Swiss-Prot record:
Pfam families: CTP_transf_like (PF01467). Its main location: cytoplasm. Keywords: ATP-binding, Coenzyme A biosynthesis, Cytoplasm, Magnesium, Nucleotide-binding, Nucleotidyltransferase, Transferase. It catalyses: (R)-4'-phosphopantetheine + ATP + H(+) = 3'-dephospho-CoA + diphosphate. This is Phosphopantetheine adenylyltransferase. Transmembrane segments: none annotated. It is found in: Cytoplasm. The lineage of its organism: Bacteria, Bacillati, Actinomycetota, Rubrobacteria, Rubrobacterales. GO terms for molecular function: ATP binding; pantetheine-phosphate adenylyltransferase activity. One of its GO terms (biological process) is coenzyme A biosynthetic process. The keyword RNA-binding does not apply.
């Protein structure tokens, strides 16, 4: 079985993330969405809560599962029996950091390949941090996050003081 890992902090999952997951699900036998923590970020929700939101919006994808990932991606990939990491690229600016990460992962797990999927043009500007900022300032995030979690995202990420 060809298993791929689609890792991220998904704080929150966006329509761009979901598009990459859907497209990856057509390329691989099984896709594991790995919800991790970024030491440089303080998410509003726990990894388990973010995983539940992703499960809700990927429920129609039979070959996609969602797991909380702790520790290194390479260790998680080994545990899952995966030899592929799928990453979305929005713009050339994403490539440099993703390339570095892919090279590090390959150093730690030589059998692990990274596959880059270019974002659809309508998602090329989209990021979780932009969604958080828009929601915190009372803006409409419709179309930026999956419909199935729109109200949840509005409630969690909106704040009257405008702080994220």
């Amino acid at each position: 079985m060809n298993i791929a890992i689609c890792p991220g902090s998904f704080d929150p999952i966006t329509t761009g993330h979901l598009d990459i997951i859907r497209r990856a699900s057509k390329l691989f036998d099984h896709v594991v969405v790995a919800v991790g923590s970024n030491l440089r970020k303080q998410p509003r929700l726990s990894a388990a809560e973010r995983a539940r939101l992703i499960e809700k919006v990927t429920a129609d994808l039979e070959n996609v599962s969602v797991e909380v990932m702790e520790g290194l991606l390479v260790d998680f990939a080994r545990e899952q029996g995966a030899r592929v990491v799928v990453k979305g690229l929005r713009a050339v600016s994403d490539f440099e950091s993703e390339f570095e990460q892919a090279q590090l992962n390959r150093t730690l797990y030589p059998e692990l390949e990274t596959v880059f999927i270019m974002s659809a043009s309508q998602h090329s500007f989209l990021s979780s941090s932009a969604v958080r900022e828009i929601a915190a300032l009372g803006g409409d995030v419709r179309g930026l996050v999956p419909d199935g979690i729109l109200e949840t995202v509005r409630q969690i990420y909106s704040r009257s003081d405008g702080k994220i």
